[in-house]
Amino acid sequence: MSKKGKKYIEAFSKVDKSKFYSIEDAISLLKEIKFVKFDETIDISVNLNLKKNHTVRDTIVLPNQFMKPKRILVFAKGDRADEARAFGATYVGDDDLINKIKSGWDEFDIVVATPDMMKDVGRLGPILGKRGLMPNPKTQTVTNNLKDAINSLKKGRTEFRANKNGVISFSFGKSSMDNEKIKENYEEFIKEVVKKRPSDLKGTFIDSIYISSTMGPSIRVEFVWR
């Protein structure tokens, strides 16, 4: 058995799988059982009770940011392009950027487009769609309000969505952060998820919540806002 494997098993043994931990206790336990030297990301997995026709998808700006600044690419022309540059977009262009991306360039993290550009940007569907970067009005990345879009993205606005199995996976902190700040991010995220409850859903919406660190075991968190 590898040294890493032994440490994981030791950490795993400290988690009571039959217990529902408070978020405060769960965060403390994650830090207690940490066995790697790097600054781990803290993730959440929310299992939802959804029907096949239900979609849960939105964006959120957490109160306490922890991720590296993202490179924002904006497809726009004329005055809109000038606005995007003024508001701090990393890359701004139209056909030039479309052709560059077609050639294999991928040094960007978020894509925003003005509505008039979407017909042309649509040609990049197979490329951007594969990376989950296709601009979409639902994620506020197709807009003429570039100031608000870019500012919120620079503040860390991030998309979350439930997969086909009704599970939302999302990163909401780093192990180096203060426990209270991790908790604040958790509470803000759960609040936003609860808002997305389908209007026709009967019964429980959130089935279970687990948090984990990059290398650590998952910990089940109690949920009291059903």
UniProtKB/Swiss-Prot annotation:
One of its GO terms (cellular component) is large ribosomal subunit. InterPro entries: Ribosom_uL1_bac-type (IPR005878), Ribosomal_uL1 (IPR002143), Ribosomal_uL1-like (IPR023674), Ribosomal_uL1/biogenesis (IPR028364), Ribosomal_uL1_3-a/b-sand (IPR016095), Ribosomal_uL1_CS (IPR023673). Pfam families: Ribosomal_L1. GO terms for biological process: regulation of translation; translation. One of its GO terms (molecular function) is rRNA binding. Keywords: Repressor, Ribonucleoprotein, Ribosomal protein, RNA-binding, rRNA-binding, Translation regulation, tRNA-binding. PANTHER family: 54S RIBOSOMAL PROTEIN L1, MITOCHONDRIAL, LARGE RIBOSOMAL SUBUNIT PROTEIN UL1M. Belongs to the universal ribosomal protein uL1 family. Part of the 50S ribosomal subunit. NCBIfam families: rplA_bact. Binds directly to 23S rRNA. The L1 stalk is quite mobile in the ribosome, and is involved in E site tRNA release. Protein L1 is also a translational repressor protein, it controls the translation of the L11 operon by binding to its mRNA. This is Large ribosomal subunit protein uL1.
